[in-house]
């Protein structure tokens, strides 16, 4: 019997009130869904409105490395797994260990992000609000499917042309910019002979803009033995941006399970100084050679706890000039008790190293070794009302100590309604910040 086709159309009207410009914005759009078979799905949106998506946490970041924000828009979340080319790109880790930022060629938060500033005359300035406000999308389309042992996905999105309020000191006027166009293509071939898993994939992305295009290509491979004890994941990629030399990078990760609940991981990566995937992906930095490892022990059905997970991990890295630019060791432990309350303890030690990023192109400088400590407690999150908090301390890069205090309360009267209240206090002493040129204080 042939499967029945499924399709849906959801038209909508969105009204946005802009209190700064004292304007009302009206958007009429529609979402489309079509599944001609169980192995193929097409979704599209025209003039989408993402006002219902959960807002991001407020993060004050004055460093040279970008903060990574999770995707929360449903259109981009659905079927996102096919574009996750390696475990390093998966942001859904539940390990107690400190995982760090992802390595991914596809970060859909770039789509509809901050606009590219328009060119203005010397002495004129664009209003800050227009430079940081998300750009509207004209539309997006996504196709995902599977044919035998081949899985594939294609995504395209188109931004509207942004408008900027410009001031030259005498009068204000409007200047129009140009939006970007985004494209993603993914192909994954899988095989499992004799119970072992083998796969090879290709992932390509493109960002097209009048100021210059950015194209990234990646090849990934995966292997797991039939017993599931040994797992290997690897990816190599290159970037080609207008006006920038072609860059290369890659990594390989090994994971070995000695027994259930006991694993050891080892990762090796290399990123040259020209690799740049951040027009549509995310890399915390380039110009790096890094080795990292992690050891995780998970125990269940203990006399005093339901589960206990202990994790110790660390990394060392240097840049292309041979400078030791980072190294640390992290010890974490999470105990989930029989009443589902939990306690999390983390201790991190960062080694003396050179910081070659936060001078913003003005050379490298030496920073001290540092210690971070934190202790957190949380009640049972499955109950309608839950709460928790944590306290922590950290050493600053050139001396001084900072302290953090966090608390939250959550009330979920039913599956469709939730109220969350969070408090974060950070008291910093000796915060090292770039001022201008070679001045850091």
Which residues make up each language-model segment?
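Surface-exposed, low-hydrophobicity segments enriched in Gly/Pro/acidic/Ser residues
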Residues: 1-318, 437-441
């Amino acid at each position: 019997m042939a499967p029945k086709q499924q399709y849906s159309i959801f038209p909508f009207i969105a009204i946005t009130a802009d209190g700064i410009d004292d304007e009302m914005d009206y958007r009429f759009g529609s979402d489309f869904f079509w599944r001609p078979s169980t192995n193929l799905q097409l979704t599209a949106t025209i003039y989408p409105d993402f006002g219902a998506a959960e807002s991001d946490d407020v993060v004050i970041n004055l460093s040279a490395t970008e903060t990574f924000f999770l995707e929360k828009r449903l259109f981009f979340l659905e079927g996102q797994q096919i574009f996750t080319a390696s475990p390093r790109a998966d942001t859904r880790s539940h390990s107690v260990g400190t995982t760090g930022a992802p390595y991914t060629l596809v970060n859909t938060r770039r789509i509809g992000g901050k606009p590219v500033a328009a060119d203005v005359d010397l002495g004129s300035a664009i209003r800050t609000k227009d430079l940081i406000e998300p750009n509207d999308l004209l539309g997006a389309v996504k196709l995902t499917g599977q044919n035998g042992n081949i899985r594939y996905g294609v995504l395209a999105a188109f931004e509207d042309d942004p408008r900027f309020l410009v001031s030259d000191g005498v009068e204000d006027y409007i200047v129009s910019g140009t939006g970007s166009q985004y494209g993603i293509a993914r192909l994954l071939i899988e095989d499992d002979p004799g119970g072992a898993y083998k796969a090879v994939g290709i992932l390509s992305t493109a960002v097209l803009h009048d100021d210059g295009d950015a194209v990234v290509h990646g090849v990934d491979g995966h292997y797991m033995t039939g017993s599931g004890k040994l797992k290997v994941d690897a990816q190599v990629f290159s970037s080609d941006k207008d006006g920038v030399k072609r860059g290369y990078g890659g990594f390989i990760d090994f994971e070995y399970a000695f027994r259930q609940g006991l694993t050891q991981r080892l990762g090796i990566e290399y990123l040259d100084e020209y690799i740049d995937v951040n027009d549509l992906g995310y890399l915390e930095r380039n110009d790096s050679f890094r080795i990292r490892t992690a050891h995780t022990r998970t125990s269940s059905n203990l006399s005093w706890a339901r589960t206990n997970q202990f994790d110790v991990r660390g990394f060392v890295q240097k840049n292309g000039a041979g400078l030791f630019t980072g190294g640390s060791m992290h010890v974490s432990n999470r105990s989930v008790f029989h009443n589902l309350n939990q306690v999390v303890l983390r201790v991190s030690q960062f080694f003396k190293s050179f910081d070659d990023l936060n001078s913003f192109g003005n050379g490298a400088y030496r920073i001290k070794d540092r210690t971070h400590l934190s202790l957190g407690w949380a009640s049972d999150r499955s109950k309608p009302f839950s709460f928790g908090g944590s306290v922590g301390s950290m050493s600053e890069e050139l001396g001084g100590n900072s302290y953090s205090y966090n608390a939250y309360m959550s009330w979920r009267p039913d599956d469709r309604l939730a109220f969350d209240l969070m408090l974060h206090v950070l008291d910093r002493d000796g915060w090292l910040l770039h001022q201008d040129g070679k001045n850091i204080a």
